[in-house]
Amino acid sequence: MNVPSEWMDGCNARTIDRAKAAYETAGRHYHTWDHVVACVERLKTFPSAQPRIVFLALVFHDAIYVPGRTDNEQASATLARDTLSAMCDITATELDAIERMILATRDHHALSGTLSADEAVILDLDLSVLGGSRDEYVRYAKAIHDEYVPAAATEAQFRIGRTEFLRRMLALPNVFLTAEGRRRWDDPARANIAWEITELTARQGFLERWISAIRRAMAGAVL
């Protein structure tokens, strides 16, 4: 990963290797090191008051990830604090800011009215894949599916939960929190989300009709 040298000021060269190793756990399809690299590449051209702090938060924001768990962000924030305090010349204020950024990724819009400018930046970068090309989005959607099914949900559970999440996103006044994020990604994100909802509901409808037909056939056999 090539980043501006000032983003690594005061940090041991092995800091990134330590973070990268955490992303090598089994079962990851989307929340991988490639996701981090993609976010960091977008940060290079994204307005930010403290890009070094946003960068360090991005590096650790999905370091701990188990599908279905609700404490991934807290565990990732703890790992970030422990690693950075040991391997970087970094202040307590900066560590607190990094922790808040990582914890904010737990629910991207729940705290939207209380976020700092750079907390909004990291959230937009984290979701920027939503506004990618259709091919990029299709790969993302498949990767999310493969992380959850069957590790944390059945196919039907995933489709229902995913559709609900996407509908909530589409109902928001803005998918992205910053003016720059909205300018770059809001319109394509809405088109991609609407496409995925159509795909999910069509397949869910087919599955429900198929199950209903099987049940009717079984009932006829019993009678």
Task: State where each predicted segment sits.
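Short, well-structured alpha-helical segments
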Residues: 13-20, 33, 37, 55, ...
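His-Asp-centered metal-binding catalytic motifs of divalent-metal-dependent phosphohydrolases/nucleases
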Residues: 39, 51-67, 76, 98-106
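Histidine- and acidic-residue-rich, metal-dependent catalytic cores
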Residues: 22, 76-111, 167
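Hydrophobic, proline/glycine-rich low-complexity stretches
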Residues: 1-17
